[in-house]
């Protein structure tokens, strides 16, 4: 597996791995009919938007690493109360 692909499959790097997998699985199950999977795509897009805002906030505050680890993301989601996307 190429290193870029491995990085994208790493839960510490990609916070939206489950959303990405769900949208790909939907495409596979629905014969690549994009209209049927639009809710999955929207959820993935909202996930990326949410975590990007967290990265920007951490960068602004000088917190490193900019992308929280998987454990930190779980804490953030618990603090929010539920998945905001």
From Swiss-Prot:
One of its GO terms (cellular component) is mitochondrion. It is found in: Mitochondrion intermembrane space. It holds the Pfam family COX6B. Keywords: Chromosomal rearrangement, Disulfide bond, Mitochondrion. Residues 13-55 form the CHCH domain. The keyword Mitochondrion applies. A motif (Cx9C motif 1) lies at residues 16-26. One of its GO terms (biological process) is mitochondrial respiratory chain complex assembly. It is linked to A chromosomal aberration involving CHCHD7 is found in salivary gland pleiomorphic adenomas, the most common benign epithelial tumors of the salivary gland. Translocation t(6;8)(p21.3-22;q13) with PLAG1. Monomer. This is Coiled-coil-helix-coiled-coil-helix domain-containing protein 7. The gene is CHCHD7.
């Amino acid at each position: 597996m190429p290193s870029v692909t491995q990085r994208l499959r790493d839960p510490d790097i990609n916070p939206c791995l489950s959303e990405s997998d769900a949208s790909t699985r939907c495409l596979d199950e629905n014969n690549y009919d994009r209209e049927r999977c639009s809710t999955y795509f929207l959820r993935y897009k909202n996930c990326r938007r949410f975590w990007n805002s967290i990265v920007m906030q951490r960068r602004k505050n000088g917190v490193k690493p900019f992308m929280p680890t998987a454990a930190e993301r779980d804490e953030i989601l618990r603090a929010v109360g539920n998945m905001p996307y």
